[in-house]
């Protein structure tokens, strides 16, 4: 089968799109999925200001949301509005470049960073109608983002790298503050998860969803749960994010002053299954492009992911085996297309690997 080249400048105006982009009936979007999902609006500044009543209310709201579907929104977050505007302008500047220029940062097979046009190199069917640019961000290496952008796209794009270096720094700060809230809501204290993620090795992703002339037969991003720990998403003013809860798809309306936050598989494991990594997707429309900024908080690559002992007892045994973020990332890049069962399948895979190693040990001695 010939793999299609996803060039938004060509395909966004066509109705005769390649069949690889058509999703099966039952998986494609329906018009009735526009019902809004009302998620808690969390005043993170109030939580951290020392106001005990505000902190208690935030802790309660976050706990309820995370046990139900794992989504909430954060306001009063301290992110400068001009930085947000710059970050969105840079999305426009990058994705409106000619395809050959974007492909200078082309994502290589088996890697999680780089430019991807609909993941045509990874998958043969049910392709997402989108382009992405992904790169790593680590607090321990402040130059990492700029160095990557300049090395792949050239010196002319240094400012783009500088904007996202600042943005990632702010996202790391905000994510650690959210970790304090999550720790408090789980009863393990504010410091536990904050310490775990202080040396994070995270992923920043720019998403661009071009218009599609067959929006009810395609998806910008297919149904999946994020394998990472925490996702902090800023949407433009074009809706498209949908969450599957209570047996149906529901939309989260964009708010310019808010970030959408959701629990990922790795944090679900860190909470011993208490907090949910929920199924979600992105839909497209036939009129205008949609853009979003996604920061995926991840642990350091070889840090062992395991819940605190206080969340494990006879009534709540271990839900998942120990693993490292490196092993889960490799699994999703090389062995398994992330979906709603990623953590379950990965856990079984780990157990099989461990059993295989144990079976080999007697023969090796």
UniProtKB/Swiss-Prot annotation:
Gene: GA20ox1A
UniProt-annotated catalytic positions: 290
This protein's name: Gibberellin 20 oxidase 1-A
Co-factor(s): Fe cation; L-ascorbate
One Gene Ontology molecular-function label: gibberellin 20-oxidase activity
Annotated InterPro entries: DIOX_N, IPNS-like_FE2OG_OXY, IPNS-like_sf, Iron_ascorbate_oxido_reductase, Oxoglu/Fe-dep_dioxygenase_dom
Known EC number: 1.14.11.-
Family: Belongs to the iron/ascorbate-dependent oxidoreductase family. GA20OX subfamily.
Record organism: Triticum aestivum
Expression sites by tissue: Expressed in nodes and the ear of the elongating stem.
All residue ranges annotated as the Fe2OG dioxygenase domain in the record: 199-299
GO biological-process terms attached to the record: flower development; gibberellin biosynthetic process; response to light stimulus; unidimensional cell growth
Keyword DNA-binding: no
């Amino acid at each position: 089968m010939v793999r299609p080249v996803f060039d938004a400048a060509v395909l966004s105006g066509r109705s005769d799109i390649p069949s690889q982009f058509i999703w099966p009936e039952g998986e494609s979007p329906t018009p009735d999925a526009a019902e809004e999902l009302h998620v808690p609006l969390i005043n993170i500044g109030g939580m951290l200001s020392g106001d005990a009543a505000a902190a208690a209310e935030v802790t309660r709201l976050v706990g309820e949301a995370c046990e139900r579907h794992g989504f909430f929104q954060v306001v009063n977050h301290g992110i400068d509005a001009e930085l947000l505007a710059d970050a969105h302008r840079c999305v426009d500047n990058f994705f409106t470049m000619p395809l050959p220029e974007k492909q200078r940062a082309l994502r290589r097979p088996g890697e999680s960073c780089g430019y991807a046009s609909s993941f045509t190199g990874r998958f043969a069917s049910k392709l997402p109608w989108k382009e992405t640019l992904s790169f790593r961000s680590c607090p321990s290496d402040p130059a990492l983002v700029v160095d990557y952008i300049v090395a792949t796209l050239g010196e002319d794009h240094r400012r783009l790298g500088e904007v996202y270096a600042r943005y990632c720094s702010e996202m790391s700060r905000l994510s650690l503050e959210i970790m304090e809230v999550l720790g408090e809501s789980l009863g393990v204290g504010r410091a536990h998860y904050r310490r775990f993620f202080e040396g994070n090795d995270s992923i920043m992703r720019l998403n661009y969803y071009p218009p599609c002339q067959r929006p009810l037969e395609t998806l910008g991003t297919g149904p999946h749960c994020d394998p990472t720990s925490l996702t902090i998403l800023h949407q433009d003013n074009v809706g498209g994010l949908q969450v599957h809860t209570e047996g149906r798809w529901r939309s989260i309306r964009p708010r310019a002053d808010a970030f959408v936050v959701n629990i990922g598989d790795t944090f679900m494991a860190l909470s011993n299954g208490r907090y949910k990594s929920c199924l979600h997707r992105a839909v497209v429309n036939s009129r205008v492009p949609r853009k979003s900024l996604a920061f995926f908080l991840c642990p350091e690559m070889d840090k062992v992911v395991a819940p605190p002992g206080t969340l494990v007892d006879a009534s709540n045994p271990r839900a998942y085996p120990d693993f490292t973020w490196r092993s889960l990332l490799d699994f999703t890049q090389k062995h398994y297309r992330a979906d709603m069962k990623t953590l379950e399948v990965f856990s079984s895979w780990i157990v099989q690997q461990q059993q295989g190693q144990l079976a080999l040990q007697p023969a090796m001695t």
